[in-house]
Amino acid sequence: MVKPTLVSNTIRAHRERAGLTQAELARTIGVTRQTLIAIEQQKYSPTLELAFQIARAFGVGLDDLFAYPTDPGGAA
């Protein structure tokens, strides 16, 4: 079983605001629709290169799309 990523994202919200379908955004960034779905559902973290491509597609920075918890493991 694939472990969900701790990285959250707002890709779906940005995509919907831009009026893009999953297929359109996937084509723009060069991935399959299934890959985009997995990223939007936080089941898969994109590579850094792909993350930049997604951010560029919306004209925003990485920190506008992705967030990582400040204490992901509950440090002792």
Model-inferred region functions:
Residues 1-17:
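A short, Lys/Arg-rich alpha-helix, primarily the initiator
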Residues 9, 19-20, 46-49:
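Residue-level signal for the short linker/turn that defines the boundary of a DNA-recognition helix
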Residues 16, 27, 56:
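Alpha-helical residues within the helix-turn-helix
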